[in-house]
Every structure is written in structure tokens, then in C-alpha cells.
Amino acid sequence: MNMLLIENCCEILDSQRVPITSTNRVKGNYPYYGANGIQDYVADYIFDDELVLLAEDGGNFGSKERPIAYRVSGKCWVNNHAHVLKPKVGLDVDYLCYSLMFYNTDGLVNGATRQKLTQATMKKMQIPERNIEEQKEIVKKLNIAKSIITHRRTQLEKLDLLVKARFVEMFGDPNDTSRDKEKRHKIGELCDVTKLAGFEFTEYINYQDSGEIIMLRGLNCKQGKLILDNVKYIDRETSHKLPRSRLYIGDILMTYAGTIGDVAMVDENDKYHLAPNVAKISIINKKKLSPVFLVHLFMYSHDYIMSFVSQVAQASINMQKIRNFEYAIPSIEEQYEFEKFVQQVDKSRVAIQNDLEQAQMLFDSLMQEYFG
């Protein structure tokens, strides 16, 4: 297939970009774009057109999930972290965007700490040449797959909101410390709270890219669930040497340094181990406290949790402060009622997640077919 150079099929409008520091921005209604999307809203605009913005530096280079190019339409302002491309006659703007979204930039970007796609290199990037009818047909198919993905993600978000609404309906707002004082208990009364000590990490832990036991880091904890698309391992022997930080079904994880208050619940024995900057919260008596209730309690009390943060060089919460978290704890029967509701919602979530994965596979296969 014939290929088109970007410099031949697009007008490159980089010279019209103007960066504005955050302190000098005048708030307004026009989107202010950077490498990865909207950064702010400002009172004026530079562009008023159908454009594709391609990350220059700070982009998601090399990612298979996060694009390096995106489409903008209408009045907007663009800073100097994104190349500005306007397709010439015969090139569909959406086709251009799809062709660049996950472009393989291996060998094209430079910079050790902040990778950069220079304009000179960008001009030599190539996209498949097709007539306008073919372009529009490809865009139509990709748009359908993308709309299904968006719809399924929206459905999942609504399920999350449904669970939160049910929690608040049953138990009230956990950020409100004035209510149900007679039912309030400190987490340290109901749970063991611990972490992987610094000397333990230094002396024993050697991360591996494959292995037997997954080290659960902060990036693996999100919205009550384990996110396992980026993991490090240790061997089982090392895990057994550090019994205090081994993880078991029902343990709750909470990030306590840097990004604070992200939580997840462990769902399997003999598979995970605690990494630095993540606290392990183990329920002492599960006849008084349900792990499902507890993880949602933490999820929905972020404002309260953040009130315990120490603002030093890196924001953090120590283990004693986590033990001092104080909450109104309902009866175990009420907790189980909420847990049953969550289980019912999770059944719907599994079906929607499967549909989402199928739609994503279709989108990925189409992108591979059309753009390699």
C-alpha cells in the first residue's frame, strides 16, 4: 500500500500555538489543550477548525491503551506540547486521527526523562493512502466500535454510582463525623493495620517481571478493585520470609503515600504480597465487620481520610493515623444486606465487562487491519 507523509497530507500549524502558564490564564469557556487532552478552560481561542492534535512531549508514547493523538473541533487554544495538524483536501480528519492514535513511535521519540516527538520527525511519519470513500468507511466502522466501548464504560460507571447511592441510603455519608456517635469505632479496634517495613523491602525484595507472587503496589489499587495490568513479582520463598506482609482473602489495601486513599480488596490466598506505600488492613473479627462493607466505607470517605494527611515533602498517612480512623459501624446483618446488593450488581457488571472486552477486541483488530 502507498503511504503518505504527514508533511504532504497535512497543514502543520505548530507556529500558531501559544503556551500560557497557569498563573497567566484567564478563565473562560474555551478548552486549553496539551499533549493528552484538555488542561484548562480559557477566555480566548487561537483555532476554530477541525484538527488533530498529536503529542509532542509528555505524550503516551508506546501505550497500547492511551492514544498519542486526538481530535478537536471548534474554538480552542493549544499549548506547545501538542503538534497541530489540519488535513488537506482528500484526507478525512477522523481517518487522520485514527491513523495516529496508536502510532508506533519506537525510534522516533527522544529524551530520557520526558520523551519528545520533534516536528522534523513528525513530518516524516507515514499513514496509509486511501481514497476518501475508503477512509470514511473505515471511520464509520471504527466509530461504531468506539461508541459501543463508550456506552459499556458509561454503563459500568452508572453501576458504580448505583452501589454508592445504595451505600449512602443505608448508612449515610461516611464523611459526616457528627452522626451515630454511639456506633463509632476506631479502625484499630476492629482491624490489624500494618505495612511492609523499609528495611524488609531493602533486604528481601527483588522485583521480577515474572514469578509466583504478585507484589501489590499503589498503582494496583483502584476503586476497591485490584488492577493487574502492570505488576511485579517475587518468589514464594521470599514471601514466606515476610509473614506480616503476606496477603489473604478479605484483606483491604490502602495507599498511604503519594496518592493517598486508593483501596482494593484481596480476592485470593497465596497469590499476593504487600509492596511499599500500601497499608494492609485485616479484619480481626469478620462476625462484626464485612470486608465488602469496609472497602466501600473507605472508598466513599475520601474527604475524611484526607483530613489525616501530613503535608510534608510527600503527602502521607502513617499506620497509627489509619488505626485512628473512626466510623459508625452498622450491624453485621445490615452489612451483609449491602454485600448481597453488591453481589447482584457485580453479576450485571461481569456481563457488561465481557461486552466491553469484546468491543475493545473488535476495535483493536480493526485498527491493526487498517493501520498495522
Please provide the spans of the model-predicted regions:
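Short, conserved charged micro-motifs
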Residues: 90-95, 287-292, 336
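Short peripheral tails and domain-boundary helices/loops at the edges of structured domains
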Residues: 84, 272-293
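Sequence-specific dsDNA recognition surfaces
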Residues: 7-53, 63-68, 188-205, 219-249
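A short glycine-rich beta-alpha junction/loop motif
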Residues: 75-81, 96, 112-133, 256, ...
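Short, ligand-facing micro-motifs at secondary-structure edges
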Residues: 18-22, 39-45, 52, 59-76, ...
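Non-catalytic DNA-recognition/assembly elements of restriction-modification systems
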Residues: 1-17, 22-34, 124-140, 151-198, ...
